[in-house]
Amino acid sequence: MIQRIFLFLSLLLQAGQICHGKIQDPTYSDLRYSGDYKRSQLDLWLAVSKKPTPLVVNFHGGGFKVGDKRSFQRNSMLQNNLARGISFASVNYPYIDQVDGDHRKLLEHCAASIKFITKNASKYNIDKNRISVMGNSAGALITCFLGHAQDLGIRSIYPIQQPKGTPLLLPHIRADGPPIIVYNRSGLNDQIHHPRFAIMLKKRCEELGLNCLAYGVEGSGLRTVPKGKDVNDLAMQFFKKSWKSKKNE
């Protein structure tokens, strides 16, 4: 029962972040990136452009047990940047019970979504050399894993609500991996998304000399978002800088 309550609250938190505007319908819905699982699908929002566009790929949260790609339709990152020439994708992936409880298998499967996009980059007018990833909670773990444990050409990473599985992820973080901007909006009472997990990630990056910006709320031990600034806007600036720089600089 407690676990169910947590999952429900996790969805509420996720919804609290993404409900900023009207629903933005995708250009393509339910594109199958793999035949392995029913949930191996993604939605794609393509910016109107004569030149190949950069792409931000989102992975939803939900403790690997719930959640759906459709939650991204109201995200302010999408709402504010699609018309500015940035394309977006939102990915579904198998739940943990569909991979027999094997977290590693689930994480590795998510790489198929990026491979599908890069393989079809010309078809969708995507610049495969300018792909960044973002994700909430469980999705935060996925983004860091794809960027650092896999060689997928990801340019930058935006994990939100870095969760308690972070210690298992840290050995995969590498000095030549993509830079990270992490944001935990929870305070000290949230044991699932405790600020210490974002701090752990930041510390590991510092040890490796990897660029990492970490933000949180007042009293969390993390730097707060500058007054008048939106963290999604800061993340987009971070993405754009990575797209202009040499790989993983």
Residue ranges and their predicted role:
Residues 70-89:
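Short amphipathic alpha-helix adjacent to the substrate-entry channel of hydrolases
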Residues 43, 183-187, 195-202, 206-249:
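C-terminal catalytic histidine-bearing segment of alpha/beta-hydrolase fold enzymes
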Residues 63-66, 88, 116:
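Serine-hydrolase catalytic-loop signature spanning alpha/beta hydrolases and amidase-signature enzymes
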